Amino acid sequence: DCAADRSGAVAAVGKYIYEHYRTHRLVAGNDSRLAAMPWRDAGVLPRFGALEPGEPVALSYARLAIAETGVVVTFTGRANPAANNLLSENHIVLVDGADLVPDMEAGWACINALIAEEGRPRGINMIAGPSSTADIEGKLVQGAHGPRQWHVIPCRWFFGGDSIE
């Protein structure tokens, strides 16, 4: 999925969670960008806060993404509880096109600039895919230490509304 605007992002999230979980419910952090999304347009029912046991889908907003490695970077704290990144069965991440950087060096420069501007976050997560391990008898196991599935939705717009095209 690639969304052209906020409505497209909401539609992509709604379609994905319904196809995989037959639900319109998810948990989203207290990020103001997520709160401003037109969730009702797609019938999505977000609960804002930290993931609780039994809730399979969490939604986050990436601070940036690194093209070279496919990594998304999230800062943890009140706006993005660590549990949402690490404990859900399925983690969905929205990434603004304006927040895409070419490589790790540019990623670290951006992280340092964000920290200088906003202060140090509780934690920094660099996520490159769903959790997996092959430690047990050499057999690949998904979801061993985190989400079994990971879905990134790039958005071709700045949150402020200006298109990057």
Question: Where on the chain are the PLM-derived regions?
Answer:
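The feature marks the mature, well-folded catalytic cores of soluble enzymes
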Residues: 1-165
